[in-house]
């Protein structure tokens, strides 16, 4: 009983610490420089590498897609923004898709260019999200399944931060979900003036 109490207190302290860090991160969103030259394929690879231990624990495969049909596999894809914030946005999305996936499922991340936009997609093979919750999932502290809060960990701010990162980069985010094929988050952002002039 004492061990369970100690574990519970430890978990609560860790959660509180993570909450404070996340709130501090969110308070700094407007002040972070957004002039970094970001190569997206490398950034995605970094995020997937950092989340590989969690994916292995949950028995979920992480997949990175190349630019798509007609594009060279090693073709670089840049956008202008905050390297720190775009990393955090992708990290939160992929982490969320891992946690809510099924065992032996997969998470696929891709980045393509469409005219003067970059389209980032993160897809899972989970059970999907109820249509009624599609907008609510971006609200702070909202959880679709509150009964799994302790199991899944976190503080309920991951997707709220994702939405704010997208917003400060003048982008958009959409959610497509199906109970049979999982959930896909699609983020669209402008590539930046410098790169538009270069092409």
What is the role of each PLM region?
Residues 129-141:
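Short conserved segment of the HATPase_c
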Residues 97-98:
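Short helix-loop "hinge" at the ATP-lid/N-box region of the Bergerat-fold HATPase_c
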Residues 104-116:
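Short beta-strand/loop element within the Bergerat-fold HATPase_c
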Residues 36-52, 58, 62-66:
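A conserved beta-strand-to-alpha-helix junction within the catalytic ATP-binding
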Residues 1, 29-36, 73-81:
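Conserved micro-motifs of the catalytic ATP-binding
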Residues 8-16:
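Short alpha-helical segment of the dimerization/phosphotransfer core of two-component systems
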């Amino acid at each position: 009983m004492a061990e369970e109490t100690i574990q519970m207190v430890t978990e609560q302290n860790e959660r509180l610490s993570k909450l404070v860090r996340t709130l501090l991160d969110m308070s700094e969103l407007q002040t972070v420089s957004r002039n970094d030259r970001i190569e997206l394929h490398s950034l995605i690879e970094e995020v997937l590498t950092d989340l590989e231990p969690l994916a292995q624990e949950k028995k979920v495969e992480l997949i990175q897609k190349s630019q798509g049909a007609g594009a060279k596999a090693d073709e670089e894809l840049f956008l202008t923004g905050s390297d720190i914030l775009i990393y955090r946005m992708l990290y939160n999305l992929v982490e969320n898709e891992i946690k809510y996936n099924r065992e032996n499922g997969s998470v696929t991340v891709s980045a393509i260019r469409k005219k003067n936009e970059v389209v980032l997609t993160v897809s899972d093979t989970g059970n999907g999200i109820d249509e009624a919750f599609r907008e609510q999932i971006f609200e702070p502290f909202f959880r679709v399944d509150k009964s799994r809060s302790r199991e899944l960990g976190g503080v309920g701010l991951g997707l709220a931060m994702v939405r704010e990162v997208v917003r400060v980069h003048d982008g958009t985010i959409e959610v497509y979900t199906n109970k049979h094929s999982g959930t896909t988050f699609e983020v669209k952002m402008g590539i930046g003036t410098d790169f538009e002039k270069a092409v």
